[in-house]
């Protein structure tokens, strides 16, 4: 299937460029972002946009643009946008973990840190809709190298190091950025938190490197045990955020629902869960609607690409083991599970099924 999946991933990346960037120029979203940036305004505020962060002008301009874009998400001016962003943030954890685990086979700890810092920053800066598809298209779906007798460099880490690094370097900055301003923190401080969160892939990569250095000389963990904790944590985050999105969205349509309010139309499943098709594009009149449309396509394409690639990994592994797969039956089951628990949750489960089997082979070979 790899010869089919790789071109599809490239096509998906092209669709992401078209829907996220080209159409954003056409519908006025980019112009709206530029106008707010030049005026120094934020969604819901007439002014207060911070201009200085690091002292490096190109980086400060990028972080300033990030604050204009992410402010309505963290400020909560649109409950539907914030709710959808939470689901998207939860799905990023399994997507990042898939990239990390696939790098850890034969790489040294320095290579693991550098590769994941670079690829993570590209995903954060350009967007997972484009970069996840490109990065996965560049990676082999074969699991043969996971059954080698060498011990991965990251096996020196403790089983809770990866989940802890995700909490400290990804979830905690998200939580700090979500604090209400000016009720709990000042507007400039909130913008600083939002800007700081942009570097979470670098923080996680450095945390993994530091944890490896602190544990140098310790007894190595079983790779399967190391990744199992991270897998369970990432799966829980993804499922909880996706199920929460579904529950609130579908409950909003019932007359006696606690979520029935002025925002019920925005929370309706058709508005919140389904991206507007390209030929249904309308002029963007508010920053919140433009950001939600942007996230719709980013999440839909990146999660589809991750699911497709992990399906190929699972397929290749079963075929290599001379197994048999009922294609249509499995595909329908995966589609149903993706709707219920999230496509990234299903993608991670498929990847872990293939990975854990090959890590067990690795362990059995080394014990001989």
UniProtKB/Swiss-Prot annotation:
<feature type="transmembrane region" description="Helical">
    <location>
        <begin position="233"/>
        <end position="253"/>
    </location>
</feature>
<feature type="transmembrane region" description="Helical">
    <location>
        <begin position="10"/>
        <end position="30"/>
    </location>
</feature>
<protein>
    <recommendedName>
        <fullName>Terpene cyclase penA</fullName>
        <ecNumber>5.4.99.-</ecNumber>
    </recommendedName>
</protein>
<dbReference type="GO" id="GO:0016020">
    <property type="term" value="C:membrane"/>
</dbReference>
<keyword id="KW-0413">Isomerase</keyword>
<comment type="pathway">
    <text>Secondary metabolite biosynthesis.</text>
</comment>
<keyword id="KW-0472">Membrane</keyword>
<dbReference type="GO" id="GO:0016853">
    <property type="term" value="F:isomerase activity"/>
</dbReference>
<feature type="transmembrane region" description="Helical">
    <location>
        <begin position="334"/>
        <end position="354"/>
    </location>
</feature>
<comment type="function">
    <text>Part of the gene cluster that mediates the biosynthesis of the indole diterpenes penitrems. The geranylgeranyl diphosphate (GGPP) synthase penG catalyzes the first step in penitrem biosynthesis via conversion of farnesyl pyrophosphate and isopentyl pyrophosphate into geranylgeranyl pyrophosphate (GGPP). Condensation of indole-3-glycerol phosphate with GGPP by the prenyl transferase penC then forms 3-geranylgeranylindole (3-GGI). Epoxidation by the FAD-dependent monooxygenase penM leads to a epoxidized-GGI that is substrate of the terpene cyclase penB for cyclization to yield paspaline.</text>
</comment>
<feature type="transmembrane region" description="Helical">
    <location>
        <begin position="192"/>
        <end position="212"/>
    </location>
</feature>
<feature type="transmembrane region" description="Helical">
    <location>
        <begin position="81"/>
        <end position="101"/>
    </location>
</feature>
<feature type="transmembrane region" description="Helical">
    <location>
        <begin position="118"/>
        <end position="138"/>
    </location>
</feature>
<keyword id="KW-0812">Transmembrane</keyword>
<keyword id="KW-1133">Transmembrane helix</keyword>
<comment type="similarity">
    <text>Belongs to the membrane-bound ascI terpene cyclase family.</text>
</comment>
């Amino acid at each position: 299937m790899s010869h089919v999946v790789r071109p599809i991933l490239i096509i998906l990346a092209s669709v992401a460029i078209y829907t996220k960037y080209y159409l954003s120029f056409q519908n006025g979203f980019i112009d709206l972002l530029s106008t707010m940036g030049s005026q120094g305004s934020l969604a819901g505020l007439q002014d207060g946009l911070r201009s200085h962060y690091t002292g490096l002008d190109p980086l400060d301009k990028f972080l300033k643009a990030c604050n204009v874009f992410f402010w309505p998400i963290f400020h909560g001016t649109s409950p539907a946008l914030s709710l959808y962003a939470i689901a998207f943030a939860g799905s990023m954890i399994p997507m990042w973990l898939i990239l990390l685990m696939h790098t850890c086979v034969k790489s040294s700890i320095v290579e693991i840190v550098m590769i994941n810092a670079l690829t993570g920053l590209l995903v954060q800066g350009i967007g997972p809709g484009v970069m996840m598809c490109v990065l996965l298209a560049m990676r082999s779906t074969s699991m043969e190298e996971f059954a080698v007798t060498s011990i991965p460099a990251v096996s020196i880490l403790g089983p809770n190091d990866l989940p802890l690094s995700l909490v400290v370097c990804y979830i905690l900055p998200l939580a700090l950025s979500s604090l209400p301003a000016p009720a709990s923190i000042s507007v400039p401080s909130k913008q600083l938190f939002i800007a700081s969160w942009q570097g979470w892939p670098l923080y996680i990569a450095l945390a993994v490197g530091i944890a490896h250095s602190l544990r140098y000389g310790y007894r190595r963990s079983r790779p399967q045990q190391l990744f199992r904790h991270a897998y369970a944590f990432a799966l829980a985050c993804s499922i909880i955020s996706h199920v929460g999105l579904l529950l609130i969205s579908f409950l909003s349509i019932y007359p006696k629902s606690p979520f029935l309010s002025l925002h019920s139309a925005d929370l309706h499943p058709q508005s919140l869960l389904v991206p507007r098709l390209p030929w249904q594009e309308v002029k963007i009149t508010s920053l919140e609607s433009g950001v939600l449309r942007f996230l719709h396509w980013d999440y839909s394409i990146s999660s589809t690409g991750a699911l497709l690639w992990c399906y190929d990994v699972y397929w290749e592994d079963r075929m290599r083991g001379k197994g048999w797969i009922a294609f249509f039956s499995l595909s329908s089951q995966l589609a149903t599970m993706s709707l219920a628990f999230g496509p990234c949750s299903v993608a991670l489960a498929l990847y872990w099924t293939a990975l854990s089997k090959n890590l067990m082979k690795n362990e059995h070979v080394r014990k001989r």
